Design a protein with these regions (language model features):
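Substrate-binding cleft and catalytic face of glycoside hydrolase catalytic domains
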Residues: 2-152, 170-184, 393-407
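C-terminal extracytoplasmic interaction modules
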Residues: 416-618
């Protein structure tokens, strides 16, 4: 029997209430939580000793076939769009747009009362629950915040300034307030050569305690194959130094892509500012310069003589959302998510769209590594205690995402931003360090897919025995380097081209080669493991190649989810299939810097690159 629930009176009767739209036979969204449940959640979190930030969130319940006028010129409004699409109608840049006029301001004014009512209601709820540590007065309203009224005014920003004052009068001085700006929004908007620091009146408001940024800037430009620029920076796209370095480097800082064609060809245009020598105003990744400099608007491209109201360094920055989808190459576009019902459905640049929980973890680790290092940022800039990881779901795992007949968005979990069910997993380097420490050993390991839920160690053994099991799973070669063991990612990094005249002359042939029998190459592999999503029951995952060949069965004492198990099985099958072709050659003493795991190519051997698996001296 269900427990009795409290009855609440609302301002809308059941008859008058608007029903959430349907999709695929069920509700498109969950309902808005009741006031009682919000108060109870706040009280429960506070009782656990946690600080609470309340975050009113706008979802767009606009189904397909809505027939609504599309401000962007389409036949109707896009299905279930991002709230950042809300704008004036027609939208800026469209024929007949009221952008830059009093008519645009009037449209914004018509929207604001309903929005204010929602935010003020949650402010009152927070007080009724005994108060909260922080509150956001909105997030990612990019399309509205950038709408210009007459005289280059920004009416929605003005409304946010007023709203912040009204929320402050409700919650009092103890609750911190901010607005969570989109990463493309926080530092201003640029139109037709003009630049406006349009949110500065809000950031400068005495009622706003911090600059909020939903920080989904690209941290990678990774591609498959051998011919891409970032392979010179890292062996794999999972490396923390590569990802953390790209927080203030690369796309959006040093350069940009002027077109989709340029992106495909990796033709990068440098970010410059030839007139005033302020390239940082065009760099959305240059958080430090934005925070530490005065801001001068450039209406019509002409720099104002006087700065905006922003006082450099006056308030900390909160990263109100960080993370990325658990999807192949998620770091290329951390803001992208998969949702088949939504017009926003997509996959990151150059992604296969397959699940990859490891890149999600690595993006979070990179942010924490970067922003918790005091040597890399001015004091007081980014508050390392305000890195909000997106997102943890209150629905119970694994019932969510498994019961898709109850929660239709469960199918999105595999590649989505959810941390639920994944936060306890480890990258291979983390697990390797933990295992080695049990044996008082030192290991240097790189992060390699998949994300691992755990590894069973049974019976007596050495650190090498345990680590070899782990590295077999993740495709790393275990080597010795001084007093440490080293895990070197196989099949990764740039290959060095060797010329035949660089090979050593010995009594044996300069180069010998053995080709494997194609009929012996495995075409199928099954991987036995423990299934994290099914209460750690024994499970198998399969990988199949289109060729004809034998079946390989491999069992490993590891805990994986279904996506990680498929990743591992496919990599193991590729490794078995590639292992038949071998070459052997000798190098002079000047080439002794090679290690197992390094890759080389040789002229006229198109099957390369070849990976060094063994080195013999003498």
């Amino acid at each position: 029997m269900r427990p009795a629930t409290s009855k609440e009176r609302t301002g809308v009767t059941r008859v008058a209430a608007r029903v959430v739209s349907s999709h695929a036979g069920g509700p498109a969204y969950g309902g808005t939580p009741s006031d009682a449940s919000v108060r109870a959640a706040i009280a429960d979190l506070k009782a656990r000793g946690l600080k609470v930030t309340i975050y009113p969130f706008v979802l767009m319940d606009i189904p397909q076939g809505n027939g609504l006028v599309d401000p962007y010129g389409g036949s109707e409004q896009s299905a279930y769009p991002w709230r950042g699409r809300i704008t004036c109608s027609p939208a800026p840049g469209q024929p007949g747009s009221p952008e830059g006029s009093g008519a645009a301001a009037a449209q914004v004014a018509a929207f604001v009362p309903g929005y204010r009512a929602m935010v003020l209601h949650y402010a009152q709820l927070a007080v009724a629950a005994g108060g909260v540590d922080a509150m956001l007065i909105g997030s990612e309203m990019v399309g509205l915040s950038s709408v210009r009224g007459a005289g280059n005014s920004f009416p929605f920003v003005d409304a946010l300034v007023t709203l912040a004052a009204d929320v402050r009068s409700i919650v009092g001085p103890a609750t911190k307030l901010t607005y969570a700006a989109d990463w493309s929004e926080y530092s201003g908007c640029q139109k037709d050569g003009a630049k406006f620091f349009h949110l500065d009146p809000l950031w400068a408001s005495p009622n706003i305690d911090a600059i909020g940024i939903d920080c989904y800037m690209p941290l990678a430009d990774w591609r498959d194959g051998e011919a891409h620029a970032d392979l010179a920076l890292a062996r794999t796209g999972y490396e923390l130094d590569y990802l953390a370095g790209n927080i203030e480097r690369g796309e959006g800082y040093d350069w940009f892509y002027a077109s989709d064609a340029d992106r495909r060809a990796q033709l990068r245009t440098q970010i410059t500012d030839g007139v005033h020598g302020e390239p940082w105003i065009w760099r959305y990744k240059d958080i430090e310069a934005f925070w530490g400099q005065q801001h001068f608007d450039r209406p019509g491209g002409v720099r104002n003589a006087f700065p905006t109201a922003w006082v450099p360094g006056s308030k900390p920055i909160w990263l109100t959302e960080i993370g990325c989808g658990a999807v192949d190459k998620g770091a290329n576009q951390p803001n992208i998510f998969g949702d088949s019902k939504s017009a926003e459905d997509g996959r990151p640049y150059f992604s296969a769209g397959t699940p990859d929980a490891l890149i999600q973890r690595q993006v979070l680790r990179a942010h924490h590594q970067r922003w918790n290092d005091p040597a890399l940022s001015p004091a007081g800039m980014v508050d390392p205690e305000r890195l909000y990881c997106w997102t943890w779901d209150a629905r119970p795992f694994p019932v969510f995402p498994a019961l898709t007949e109850v929660w239709s968005d469960g199918t999105n979990h595999a590649t989505g931003h959810w941390l639920t069910g994944r936060l306890g997993g480890l990258a291979s380097d983390e697990l390797a360090h933990a295992l080695a420490s049990e044996f008082d050993s030192l290991v240097l390991a790189a992060p390699s897919a998949p994300l691992i839920g755990g590894l069973t160690v049974s019976g007596a053994g050495t650190a090498r025995d345990v680590l070899e099991t782990l590295f077999d799973l993740t495709g790393q070669k275990l080597a010795a380097r001084g007093d440490a063991m080293v895990g070197i990612a196989q099949g990764a990094g740039q290959a060095l081209e060797l010329e035949y005249d660089a090979l050593a002359s010995t009594d044996a042939p300069v180069l010998s080669r053995r080709r494997g029998d194609g009929a012996e190459r495995p075409a199928r592999l099954t991987l036995g493991h423990f299934d994290r999503e099914r209460d750690y029951l024994a499970a198998t995952s399969a990988a199949i190649r289109p060729d004809q060949g034998p079946l390989v069965t491999q069992n490993m004492p590891v805990v994986l989810d279904s996506g990680a198990a498929r990743q591992a099985a496919e990599r193991l099958l590729d490794q078995h299939a590639a292992g038949g072709d071998r070459i052997e050659f000798a190098l002079p003493p000047g080439q002794i810097g090679f290690e197992p795991g390094d890759r080389v190519t040789l002229p006229d051997l198109a099957e390369g690159p070849f990976e060094i698996t063994e080195i013999r001296d003498g």
